[in-house]
């Protein structure tokens, strides 16, 4: 499967608990921090919850 590069671009101040936990599960703690994760259903579900806090790019 392909990978996705996820970068946190907005703060979690004012975010709901589920959004903070989703970012923690993805491995993001700071603004402009980037992680590479496998593109699967679980990752896509987490990204759906925090789509307004992150940017997503495909990695080939």
Swiss-Prot record:
It comes from the Bacteria. GO terms for biological process: translation. Signal peptide: none annotated. GO terms for cellular component: cytosolic large ribosomal subunit. Part of the 50S ribosomal subunit. Belongs to the universal ribosomal protein uL30 family. This is Large ribosomal subunit protein uL30. It comes from Mycobacteroides abscessus (strain ATCC 19977 / DSM 44196 / CCUG 20993 / CIP 104536 / JCM 13569 / NCTC 13031 / TMC 1543 / L948) (Mycobacterium abscessus).
């Amino acid at each position: 499967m392909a990978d996705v590069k996820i970068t946190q671009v907005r703060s979690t101040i004012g975010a709901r608990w589920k959004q903070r936990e989703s970012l923690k599960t993805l491995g993001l703690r700071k603004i402009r921090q980037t992680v590479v994760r496998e593109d699967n259903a679980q990752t896509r579900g987490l990204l759906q919850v925090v789509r307004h806090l992150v940017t997503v790019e495909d990695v080939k």
